[in-house]
Each structure stands twice: as C-alpha cells, then as structure tokens.
Amino acid sequence: MASKSEKAVKKAQKLSKEPSVELTDTKSSDNVTPKQKSPNSTEEDVSLNLKTLKAKKFKLAFVLITVLSFITRFWNLNLPGEVVFDEVHFGKFASYYLQGKYFFDLHPPFAKLLLALVAKLAGYDGHYLFDNIGDNYKDNGVPYVTIRAWPALLSSLVPPVVFLIMKESGYDLLACIVSSSLVLFDNAHVTEGRLILLDATLLFSMVCAIYCYVRFFKLRHTPFSRPWWAWLFFTGFFLSCTISTKYVGFFTFLSIGLSVCLELWYLWDIKTGLTVERFFQHFLARFFCLIFFPFLFFLFWFYMHFNILTISGPGDSFMSLEFQETLSDNPITANSTILNYYDIVTIKHMGTNAFLHSHPEKYPIPYDDGRISSGGQQVTGYQFDDENNYWMILPADHYDPPIEAKLNVPVKNMDYIKLHHVGTNTDLMTHDVASPYHPTNEEFTTVSVDESAGKKHEYTLFQVVMSDNTDPQRPLYTKASSFKLIHKLTHVAMWSDPKPLPDWAFKQLEINGAKNIQTGSIFWTFDDIIGLKDSRLKKEKKIPKKLPFWKKYLELQLTMFRQNNMLTEFHPYSSNPSDWFTLHHGIAFWAKSEENKQIYLLGNPIGWWIIAGTVLSTTVVAAAEILLRQRGIRTLPETVRNHFYRSTMFFYMTYVFHYLPFFIMGRQLFLHHYLPAHLAGSLLVGAFIQLACRKSFRSPVSAGVPIPKDVDEKGHSKCHRKYGHVIELICTLLLIFVVIYCFTFFAPMTYGDKSLSVDEWTRRKWLDSWVFQYQKQN
C-alpha cells in the first residue's frame, strides 16, 4: 500500500499537468513565490520543484524560439543585393526624407521615418531613389544590409512576443510553441520581415499592443496600481504605433477596443459595487491612455513629417496650391505671376487637368437620350494646348466706358468677372438648361458680345472665390492660386466631368455648372498668361508661406483617403480576400530568370490551411455552444467556458477584425494585407488545440443524465485528463514537423538565394494559380 508521501507526489504530478485557464489567476512562472512550508511538507516540495521545472521549460522554449527567429530573418540578409518589389517605394521615401523633399504616400509616416533614421545612422545621404526592381545596391552605394536589418530585427521579435502572449494568457507550453512556430516558420512573414518594407513594424507593434493589453487585463483586480497604469499606457502607445505605420492598424484598435468596451460594461454593472464616480475614473483612464495619448503620438509623426519635408518634391501635385506655397523651390509658386484684367489666360481644372475650351461647333438638338439642349456654342474641357483654350479676363463693367481706368488692375478674390473667348469673340455664360451628361447640372455655353453687354449681362457674370477665402482683397496669381468660379445668377460652380463627351464634341470633357459648390473637385487655376510682355516677367524670389499644422494635416488626411479609394485599377498580383484564406495567390517580388532564382511572396501553405481550418472550427464550436446553452445544455465546464470567451474568442475576434473589413474595400488588395489576420489566427490555433486536446465536452445527448463516475465536478473526463496531454503533444509535434518541412521546402523562393531546376520549381507549384518566374529548358 502506498505511503501518504507517495500519494502526495502522485497528486502533485496530476495537478501539474492541469493548465491554468483563468486569465486573471494565471501568473507568470517567473514570479512564482513558494508558500512558507513546514519542515515535513513533502507535497509542497514537489509542487515547488514542478513549478521550477515548468518555468525552466518555458524559458528554454522562449530562448529557442527567439534564436530561431533571428536566424530565419537574418539568414543571407545581403541577398539579393538588388531592389526587391516595394523597396522601390519605401527605399525611395527614405531617400526623400534624407533630402527633405516632399513626397506623397498612402501610409502614415512613423515606419518610414524609422527607416530613414536607420539609413541616416548608416551614413546614407539619400542620393539614390531606388528607381527600378533589380537595380544593384552596391553599384548605387546604398547600405542596404544595414537598412534591411531594422525590419529584420522587428520581425525577429514577433514570434517571441507571440509566445509571451500565449504564456500570459494562461496557455501551456505546447500551445505557446504552436502559435509562435506558425509565425516563426511562415514564409510570407519572413519575406516581408527582411526587406525594406513597413509590415515588420506593423506586426511588431500589433503583437506588442496585444501583449501589453493581456498584461493589463490580468491586473484588473488591482486597478490604478503602478503596473496597471504602465501596461495600460504601453497598450495605447503600441496601438498608436500600429495605426501610425498603416491605417489597417485601426483594426487592432477595434480588436482591443471591443474587449475594453465589454470590460467597461461589466464594471458598470451595479453588482460590481463600483460607485459612478469610480466607474468614470476607470473610463477616463482608458480614454486618455487608449485614445487621447495615442492620438497625440499619431499627430507627432505627422508633425515630424511636415518639418522634415520642406523642399518641393514629387508629392507637390497631390496637394493644394496653398499647401505647395509652404514648400521652398516650388516651381509653381516660383513661376507664378499676378493676374491683371485684360490678360489672356489659360484656365485649368485641378481635377482633370483639362483646359477650359470652346469652339464654333454647337450642342446637338436633341441629345441621344431625347433631352433638349440650347443648341449653343460648345464649352468643353480639353487636355492639350490649343488656341481655343485662350480666354480674356474682363471686369464685370467692361462694357461701361472708359476702359483705360481698368487696365493694369489686379484680379482679386471675390471679384465678379467675365471670360471672353478670344477665338470666337464670345463671352462665357451658363443658364438653366441641363448639361449633356447631368440633368441636374447646368449647361455652359457662350453668347455674343452684344448679348453679353445687353440682356444676357447677368448670365455672363462669375465670382472668383479662392480656396483660401480669408482675404477678400487678395490678388490672384497664375499657377499658385486655386479658385472656384461661381455663377452670379444661378449660384452654380463651373466643373469638369472626367467622362469624355461623344464624337459630336470630339471626345472632349464636359463642362457644366454643379449645384454643390462645397465639393473639392470644382477648383481651377489660371495656368498661364499668353503673350505677357510687361514688368511682371521679372520673377522675385518668393519666401515659403506658413500654414497651420492642423490645416496641413487635415488636407493630407483627405488626400490620402481619396487617393487610396482611387486605387481600383487592375494589378497582375492583386488578389481578393477570399483568395488569402486558402493562399490561392502569391506575389512575384523579384526574379533572376537566367539563374532561376526568385523571391515569391507565399505563406507557409500548411500553416495557412491549419489556420483556416481552426477559424472555421472555432466558429462552429462558438455557435454550437451558444445555441445549446440557450437550450440548457452545458457543453463546456464553467472555468473552461470563461477562458474560451475571454481569451480564445478574443484571438478569434482579432482575426475577424483584421480580415473581414477587406471584403468591403474597393481598392487594390494584396496578399500581405492578410498578415495581421494570419498572426491573430496563429494565436487562435494554439488556444484551440489546447482546448480540443485537454478539455472535455459533455455530449448533448447526456443532458439531464446523472454525471458519469469518470467525469469530475468540473466536467473533465478522467480518461481525457490522463491522455489529453499526450494527444496534445502528438498533435503539436506533428504540426511543427510539417510546418518546418513546408517552410524549408519553399525557402528558396523566400530568400532568393538558391537556383532551382525547372523540375524543382514545378514540384513547388502546388496550385496552378501560383505564378513562378523561371526559364524553361528547351
């Protein structure tokens, strides 16, 4: 018969195999403090030894994951020694930062500023603009290995942080290893993480935000303590870093924000015993740390962006003329000339770059759709130089003598003017007749000089309203002044539709009067003065103007979102979100066909398909649990259920928030947009495997039947407790083996460092939709 001490040892060993599932009660194995024990407490000795052994296993696994992560990311970092895919863009942006030249990009500046800083510290001066994929770095004197080392460093830290997230969330060692390995040995993460790109910064910031939030959540029973404040603050800081890198970081805000809202809803419950005052202290703490301060950090990077990029550059054309006036050496402001009445000018629409144009041809009566036009002279938009683009600016009282008093008078903001078409000797007008394409917009045409001076006088008056409408007496300049032309009588604004008119208008653009005079697409510029010969030809050096930060920031934000929505054209490597789930498409990053080398962005197929299966399985389990619980059927023990919804479903919702929004986006999308969702899916896989292997489910058919003898009070099957760890171990080893094999199998296209034969490339083409680039043998 076993002694009491032997029974105690066996009991402790069994207890040690049970993972802690309650997020709040799970403590880091680094901080285990043994209880004070009596001299003969054998059970406590065994428990302490087991905890120490467990802590050592976690540390050993963490170190191994970290070392392997650095090896996979830094392996042959110097290869290829050529520009790869979007290094064309982000390397160029780093050069522009170092040159101080203004550029435009769709992404916030944080990660790009970091790349520029690393390049600066490496001694790079920004002389090379990363012009083409395949350009040799050494030939152009670029310290590319040092610059690549920064994203490689951040990418190397992602798998270890994933490991820590799982550990702090209460999962066992095997679950931690599974989740971190799916990121560690993912080919797409490695490819994106070792090049001059932004995704390494995005993913590192994302996992750090999740890790900090988990640490903060575990301290919810000790609110307002120093550690509580610290983890809350760092959660907000890393959330700010995610959205300051790419706007998809907003999805991380949503993921953590949902959890925070649910937590606040729980605290609002009167059963918690919190006073209203105490609740609002909780609310304000989260508001300032998770919204207010992150927004300040976000603004700071734009402030740095504007203060560094002070010289005119390739991004000027995306911004308003008012913005461009703040940049030194801007050709538009440098070559601008003050406008006087009776100048002959060309007038350009800022949206379509079409010149205001007219010719003797008339509008057809009727149009093809049966609507009736005025039959007047056509006024169109023409995107090329032509003498029919010439218009003379006349004062509103031009036909009232004497004219001499009106010569050499500047045209000013808010003035009423007439526009005289030089080629046909007619004046511009609009009236209450529908335009060719827009029944609600007014037709633009011209009238004779006699009519303009007589009964049509009011119809030919237009007010010049500058985009910067603060000074009503501000003079207008060519190129540098943007304005809208508002009709005095009907209050419509002249606008150019980008859709070409039919053959009767020679495929030129429609000019019409838009009733919405607040839209940003109705602005024009006086592009040039024809035949200028007076003293205005002498250009004086202009000092850049000042513009408030908020005005520059808001304009840039609107431009970024507008340009982002315009990215709808077909791209040979774009893909749909539904393709990412099964890894249906990849992206050709770089190729050297003569050597049969290439870099092809492709995830680890086995890892991606495991994540896809886990997402579907979790969806089924969660739906079944909710539906059955409504019928009074408990499928999960209460402790397991709490952990499932607090932790596993948090990872699930993080995946959902980083994946589903792409289905409603109309812009071009690429495989790398899925990487944040893949990372969240990796966390979910580890959690789900532990749940499936270590926790029992009570069968619905046994509801109402007495609990069997082999099931304890928590719903754990004795058989399940005995063999669950073994099952999980087998599943983990099998999964990791397959994932590592798959990673090494596709490694040549991850690193681009190995020439493969045609047969070897063909064997790697598991799906016909994967388009590899290599020379086929004759």
UniProtKB/Swiss-Prot annotation:
It is a multi-pass membrane protein. The keyword Repeat applies. Belongs to the glycosyltransferase 39 family. SMART domains: MIR. Residues 1-28 have a biased composition (Basic and acidic residues). Pathway: Protein modification; protein glycosylation. Residues 29-41 have a biased composition (Polar residues). Glycans are attached at N40, N335. GO terms for molecular function: dolichyl-phosphate-mannose-protein mannosyltransferase activity; glycosyltransferase activity. This is Dolichyl-phosphate-mannose--protein mannosyltransferase 4. The gene is ogm4. It comes from Schizosaccharomyces pombe (strain 972 / ATCC 24843) (Fission yeast).
